[in-house]
Amino acid sequence: MDPAAPVAQFTVPLGGQKIEMHQMDFAAGGLALLRVRIREGKRFTVFDIDPETARTWGEAMLAWGRSHPGSPP
């Protein structure tokens, strides 16, 4: 596995969760996954997702965000 390449990092305004996204490249087989890491205090939740799932998840989040314009963060 190659080193993780940072994609994005931000903090959720309301809950304070820290979200990090990294690209994970696996040399054997050419597999690339997006690692989403959510930190809530001392607890971590980690998802490794494939490109198709990332697109589906991202599109769903964009659609929801666009349907709530002007909402406070």
What positions do the PLM features span?
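Positively charged, low-complexity terminal tracts
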Residues: 1-73
